[in-house]
Amino acid sequence: MFFSISFSDKPLINLNKEMAMTVELLDFPEIDGDFLRVEGKELEKKEKLLIQYRIHSIEEKKKLEQSILPFMTCRLSGKLKSPPLPRNENAFNYQRYLKGKDIEYIFELGTWDVNQCKKLRNNWNSILLHFRRYGIHKIEETFEKNVQPLMSALIFGEKSQIDESINEAYQKLGIAHLIAISGLHVGIITGLLYYVLLRIGLTKEVVSNFILLFLPMYAILAGASPSVNRAVLMTGIIVLSQKFHRQISSIDAISISFLITILYNPYLIYHAGFQLSYAVSFSLILSSSVILRQKKFFKQLFLGSFVAQISSLPFILYHFFEFSLISLFVNLLFIPLFSFIIIPLSFICYISLLIVPLLSPILIFLLSTCIHYSNELIMCISKWDPFIFVLGRPSITILFIYVVCFLSLFLQLEKTMKNLTYFTFSLMFPIFLHFASTVVNPYGEVVFIDVGQGDSILIRLPFFQGTYLIDTGGSLSFLKEEWKTRKNEWNVGGDIVIPLLKSKGIRTIDKLILTHGDHDHIGAAKQIMQSFNVKELMVSETLDKKDGEKDIIRYAEINSIDIVKAYRGLSWEVGKHQFRILHPKKGASSSNNSSIVIHALVGGKKWLFTGDIEKDGEEEINELYHHLNVDILKVAHHGSNTSTTETFLKKIRPKISIISVGTNNRYGHPSESVLEELKSNDIEIFRTDLHGAIKYQFFLNTGTLYTCLPYDS
């Protein structure tokens, strides 16, 4: 494996320079709104690439949908880029994800001339991919909208059509494995094939040969995800061993498949689906004798679900930071429903649609009814917040303790199921330790979250004495033509702030402080209040409020969240940590200059959080506070030249400045004049556009500044 890793790095190619290359496309393009992506292979150096293209018109979109086919060769021009590193702590690592697909670079195109593409002769891969696409389109044409996405996922492994809210509900309840093709699906299909082919009179030898031929074809049809490949490879090894009259155990089969996969691509070890697939399958195989020892089906189901839940828990917490307390019981309900009704009925419906169309309407009605009510029930259960427990990402030490405790639990399970005390301790001890590690934490932190062009600052005091969020960031949404709209639009709250807070084990926010009403500061506030227990909402004491602010305040009132109007002179203390509102005065008009300005003593440093305050506000603070020393300044208004004057800087004398600003933003922030002013005053500059999230972690009165991206002064 180490040998494989050492030779997996590709030679570096000139990046960010316009170049032309001939590329073979490896699949159908994925077109979402006005965005196209497709995997390809550069023919000269055999380099696998992810090709991305922004479509310019609806006519071009239709032309690309009709013209671009797998295994075409195209002459394309664009810029080669490295996949982005995560810009926030515990964020999804897209670069590592692409390496798991053996992709080192992204090729961004400026234009795509379909006349520069030509179709080579069909191969088996191409034929299977065409059949897969035909099947997905057939489902889209025939079935109702609530049935299409799930059927495509269950038959062809195409999950991109599933609504984000439904996908999240399955994930929250720990039943996402039911809509990902895995050993369950491969087992059902292989078992049915084996039975049918034997019944029609074929010999075992012929059936084995057919299954060995069918399995790799099915892997391509099913999307070739890590869980599909694991199940197909493992089944193939077992069938092959039987063919040569050499009995191989399931544990040997899964071990061989693991080694083959890792030797082929070591980076797959980081893939969440790969980890979950192997961890759960391995645990179920090891526990199979105990599970099958139970005579009643319900006991077997309960024990199997229990083993699957326990073995997947460390990985679920590492990647998704939370789990459902009722996941085991939800699995007991939905595993039989999917195994015996929904999955078989999906395949029967699809096959009948191709062979006996007259039977289809009755079967489709039955399937639609099952899927509709199961989705409704899943959505309903997932909204019961008391059952969703946020623990955060476990440290390596905590992960190790999880593994040791759960392995000892499985070993005890092999001997006896009567030692309830041992089971309870082995199960609860790592969970309790994980919970305690977030609550009884002597370290505090101030995190400037990278939310693009906006502000969001997390202050977490030691031992969870206080958790404050100053602003939330917000995605500005512009009216788009319908053809440009994507299925699941990106948003700051759901994609950045909420996952980050959950990854730190945060369940409660003591103060949600909204400095002023601009969307790039408050746009995700409602999502935050829906996702966490917010005790207090602090807003600026202004006479006029924007519609967005009014909407947030109304939501807080309806949900019994305390609302505090911030004004000059308001202060609070938690231990040695002090917070004081310097601005605005009561009855200020609603503008950038009415931003809440907070002077804080946290972690032995004096901080000034300025919102979007401008020159007039800075002058007012200068006049009122003559001895306002600051160690770390949050530069106002993303470094705009309307703020951060020389007079203000000389008055407060910060040593470090932090600018929260979006990469290549349309406003040209930060201003060159502001940067020069900071440099001329010997103030060190940190920027979220260059450094990603910026974190000050402290213990007692000393701390260290960290950046998420490599820091280059």
Describe each PLM feature range:
Residues D102-M234, V239, K511-I513, E536-V539, ...:
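Aromatic-rich juxtamembrane segments at the membrane interface
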Residues H519-E557, P654:
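Active-site HxH/HxHxD metal-binding segment of metal-dependent hydrolases
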Residues M1-K10, N14, I200, L286-V447, ...:
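Transmembrane helix-bundle segments that form internal channels/tunnels in multi-pass membrane proteins
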Residues Y267-I269, S382, F389-I396, F400-V403, ...:
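Core dinuclear metal-dependent hydrolase active-site scaffold
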Residues A180-I181, S255, H271, L469-T472, ...:
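Active-site neighborhood of phospho(di)ester-bond hydrolases with catalytic His/Asp-centered motifs
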Residues L514-T515, H519-Q530, H583-P670:
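Active-site-proximal loop/helix segments of hydrolase catalytic cores
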Residues F2-H177, D495-K502, T508, T542-D544, ...:
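Membrane-interface helix/helix-cap signal primarily in integral membrane proteins
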Residues E164-L328, L391-N441, E541-L543, E646, ...:
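Hydrophobic alpha-helical transmembrane segments in multi-pass membrane proteins
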